[in-house]
Amino acid sequence: HCRNRETFLKFDRKIFFCHIPKTAGTSLRLSLEQAVGDAAVVPSQALISHHGGRYPPLHEALQELQEKPDYRLFRGHYGFWVRRYLPTDTLTIAVLREPVERILSHIRHFLADGRITEADAFESLDQGRLPIPDNTMCRYLGGTPIKAEGQELSDRFLAYRFDPIDDHDSLFKRAVSTGRSVDIMGFTDEMPDLYEKISQETGLPLTMRQDNPSRYPELSLSDRQLDTVRRHNQLDLQLYEAM
């Protein structure tokens, strides 16, 4: 680990981990936090605790960035475009997951949180609707900067997850080109490779972990319900293929 430590001491770029929900990102996030040390992370654990264990609204996270200029790691469920608030040489990391698996995990997350009931979820799918945001990976990578500040910025970013996509083609193209610009892109089913890449690049001693597994049992969907999931996530399916 000594050699790694020396590399990290020389590695003076900040790190932005764009944490797309339900991509096994929590395990990576905790490994990164452990490696850089809690004091060097934004949003801070205190701010996250203040929000009941969730990432804080975007404007509060950005406010903390201003207050902690010596941070090493910025991470959260924030769109990739947020990197415009970070130094230009920031090392960027993102993780993609097979889209149908990611959606099922996301639905289970909403069920575990009590945000929807299983009856509602299945009824939505039976009616051809998705009970959670669609094409989340494309939205995170291909979303455009929101020109607002303070609470309005956070509100609009949250609303954007559910807003109808007005131009599928341009969102997809932006997501692909952004995806290709990410310094270190990982995949949920190849996590050891990702840890290896990050360690080599940064010298951080990362430890593989298994965190935040779903607190809700596996879902068993009918073919028709799975078709609904696929139909509503065409962009993410294409993005995953393209990467």
Regions of interest found by a model, annotated:
Residues 2-70, 75-80, 106, 112-114, 189, ...:
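PAPS-dependent sulfotransferase catalytic core
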Residues 16-20, 91, 182-190, 224-231:
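Conserved aromatic-histidine-acidic binding/catalytic patches
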Residues 19, 96-97:
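Short beta-strand/turn micro-motifs composed of small residues
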Residues 24, 98, 186, 198, ...:
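A residue-level signal for conserved active-site and pocket-lining positions in enzyme catalytic cores
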Residues 42-49, 103, 208-218:
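A generic structural motif
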Residues 49-95, 101-207:
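PAPS-dependent sulfotransferase catalytic domain
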